[in-house]
Design a protein with these regions (language model features):
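N-terminal beta-strand motif that seeds the catalytic metal site of vicinal oxygen chelate
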Residues: 1-21, 30-33, 105-112, 162-199, ...
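Accessory recognition modules or surfaces
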Residues: 2-13, 17-20, 27, 33-72, ...
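Conserved active-site tyrosine of GNAT-family acetyltransferases
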Residues: 20-25, 124, 197-202, 272
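A cross-kingdom feature marking solvent-exposed beta-strand/loop segments within repeated
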Residues: 36-62, 90-109, 127, 132-143, ...
């Protein structure tokens, strides 16, 4: 499981979509590329099930396919990574709204395309993960969310492989002249106990790429897991002055950063500083940029030279 997954997007829940999109574009990091394209059309009946709370209370709706779609999401193209920015009203009514009320804005799910959505979903269910959202058309799953929040407080969302329309849309976004030539590396997930979190995600089918080790520059110990083509870094803060400790104290466990490999780290830092970015930590190997004002997420650049 996960070896043949393709990243679809990182899902950030916010209260102000435009503010989040503007932040990344103003800093020269991301380009607002509009909502995601429609799922492939198939005539028939759709079914939508979702938890009204994080812990349950499911509801089911049925609909005829082909009706109008109210696009609410925005998307920021950051390098070759798509960041979905979805506005929600904090409070009761849907599990994501409750998540937003408890933690504030932030990335709460990672969406992948998989050639075996039914088999992969079954694997998660067998490991005790609840199916908190499931959309089907004529009985076939087109999108779901699985509750993998036990460690790391992040959910996994699965979709079937993208069709040519969506693939072309993504390729066109990446060719925009303002999109940075950044290569998406992965996400950093702050956790209370790196060892326990590692064991949990290995049981879910993630692959261990680097054992737990320390970074004194960041004030953390962390390990690298691989899921699909991306790194899933579990980060346990060890220093009180670490920015990752700040993230943990404010929001608890969860995705704290998005990381990208860049060819010229010094040049990228200079460009971002000229646009008003705040540099938190930098070495010859990486730089940490503070973009928590909208979305509670840091950008980390890795020297790929």
């Amino acid at each position: 499981m996960s070896d043949d997954w393709t990243l679809n997007h990182l899902g950030m829940m916010v209260t102000d979509k435009n503010a989040a999109l503007n932040q990344f574009q103003t800093l020269g990091m991301g380009v607002s590329v509009g909502p995601q394209p429609l799922q492939p059309y198939e005539e028939g009946v759709g079914e939508l099930m979702y938890f009204q709370t994080l812990d349950g209370d499911p509801v089911i709706h049925h609909y005829k396919t082909g009706g109008p779609h109210n696009f609410r999401d925005g998307n920021s193209q950051i390098g070759d990574c798509q960041l979905e920015v979805y506005p929600m009203k904090p409070g009761p009514g849907m599990f994501i709204s409750e998540y937003l009320e408890k933690k504030g804005p932030g990335i709460n799910h990672i969406a992948f395309n998989t050639p075996d959505i039914e088999g992969d979903t079954k694997r998660f269910l067998e490991n005790g993960c609840n199916l908190v959202f499931n959309a089907t058309v004529n009985g076939k799953t087109i999108e779901n969310y699985l509750d993998t929040r036990k460690y790391g407080d992040v959910m996994i969302s699965l979709r079937p492989p993208a069709d040519e329309w969506e693939i072309t849309w993504r390729e066109n976004n990446r060719l925009h002249p303002l999109v940075k030539n950044w290569k998406f590396f992965g996400v950093g997930v702050v956790v209370e106990d790196c060892a326990l979190a590692t064991e949990y995600f290995l049981n879910l089918g993630f692959t261990l790429k680097k054992e737990i080790h320390e970074s004194r520059d960041l004030g953390v110990k962390f390990c690298h897991l691989k899921v699909g083509s991306m790194m899933f870094e579990l980060i346990q803060p060890t220093a009180d002055n670490s920015v990752y400790k700040e993230c943990f104290n404010k929001r608890g466990e969860g995705i704290a950063d998005i990381s990208f490999a860049v060819e010229d780290l010094s040049s990228e830092i200079g460009s971002l500083l000229e646009k008003g970015a705040e540099l938190l930590v930098s070495t010859n190997e990486f730089a940490v940029i503070d973009t928590r004002r909208e979305g509670n997420t840091i950008i980390r650049l890795l020297n790929n030279a």
